[in-house]
Structures are given as C-alpha cells and as structure tokens.
C-alpha cells in the first residue's frame, strides 16, 4: 500500500476544492491510501475572520509526519509568485527531516491557485526548489490531461501542475476543467507511488 498525502493551505477555499479533486483522483488508484491534511493557519483568528477566511475541516498536519508518506502532493495559493506564507512556515520547520534525509526519494507534486493567472507556474517551480533540497522526486503532469489543450475559456492548469484562477476578488470557483486536471494529477502521482512502493 502506497501512502499519499494531499497537503494544502487555503484561505478562501479554492485550494481546498482543488485538494479534494486531487484526492478524488488519487483514490481511484488501487493500492493507494490517500490522506488529506492542511498546514496550520498562522494568521491571528480575528484577522483571518476579518479577511473573509474560510473555516476548513481537514485535520492539521505536522512537519514530522511527512516522513510517513510515499508521495506528497502540495497545494498552495500564489503569493507574489511564491507559495503562501503559511506553507512556507510549515516547510521551514522540516529542517530535521532534511538533516536525516527522511524525505529523500519520496514523490512530490504541486498544485496552485492565483487571482489573475500571474505567477501560477512560478509558484509551482519555486516550491519545487524546497522539495529538491529534500531530495524528493518532482512529478510534473506534462500535457497528458487533455483539458490543458483547451484555450476556449479562461482556465488554469499547466504542465507543471493543476492550477485554478480565482479572479481578483476571489469570486471565480475552480471550473470543471481545472478540477479534472487536478483529479488527473492525483491519479497520476498515486499511480507512480503504487508502482514504486506498492
């Protein structure tokens, strides 16, 4: 059995929705045990509420537990072309895992969201840098998801990983095409994890 963690941060629910789709895709793979968790919120509760943050039910992960999984699919909103501060804070606590090589050889993939599309690919590739320092095997999705060829509408999604465009005010929710790409990413990564560890 390959253990797959979908680990995300979501303030307004866009990445949470994408995380559920990633997990749904991963759960299609026989021999994959899929867990969905989120990183801790670092914003004070009053400010989080004032900013319109969405309460989420996924359990909170600890950095130490990352060593328990064969594959980790990270989801983060874009903050100026980088991962969110909450995800950065979480990953900055993995120094002990780095020192022991606990994540070396584990699969890693990334999905993201942006307000207007700017920085979605940069967010994924800049997150890869941290994962590479851990010796994780980076898994992009390429162009196997056919939705990536559809240019008839505004759509997130890249060969690096699934993305969604939330709109400047956050009112746009992930489209069916974006969720389909996210499901593909989960299924693809889980399938590789089972082949390597199952």
Swiss-Prot record:
Binding-site residues for NAD(+), renumbered to this chain: 12
Origin species: Escherichia fergusonii (strain ATCC 35469 / DSM 13698 / CCUG 18766 / IAM 14443 / JCM 21226 / LMG 7866 / NBRC 102419 / NCTC 12128 / CDC 0568-73)
Gene3D superfamilies: 3.40.50.360
Name under which the protein is recorded: NAD(P)H dehydrogenase (quinone)
GO cellular component labels: membrane
A Pfam family: FMN_red
Origin: domain of life: Bacteria
Swiss-Prot/TrEMBL cofactor(s): FMN
């Amino acid at each position: 059995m390959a253990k797959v963690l979908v680990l995300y941060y979501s303030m307004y629910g866009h990445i949470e929705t994408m995380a559920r789709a990633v997990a749904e895709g991963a759960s299609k793979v026989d021999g994959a045990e899929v867990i969905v968790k989120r990183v801790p919120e670092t914003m004070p509760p009053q400010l989080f509420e004032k900013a319109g943050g969405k309460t989420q039910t996924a359990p909170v992960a600890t950095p130490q537990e990352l060593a328990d999984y064969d594959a980790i699919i990270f989801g983060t909103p874009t903050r100026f072309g980088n991962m969110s501060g909450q995800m950065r804070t979480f990953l900055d606590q993995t120094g002990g895992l780095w020192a022991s090589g606990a994540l070396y050889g584990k699969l890693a993939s990334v999905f993201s969201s942006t307000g207007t599309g700017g920085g979605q690919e940069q967010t994924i590739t800049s997150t890869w840098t941290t994962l590479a320092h851990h010796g994780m095997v980076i898994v992009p999705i390429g162009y196997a998801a056919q939705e990536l060829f559809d240019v008839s509408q505004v759509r997130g999604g890249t060969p690096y990983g699934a993305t969604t465009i939330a709109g400047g005010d956050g009112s746009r929710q992930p489209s069916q095409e974006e969720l389909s790409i996210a499901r593909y990413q989960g299924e693809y990564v889980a399938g590789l994890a089972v082949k390597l560890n199952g």
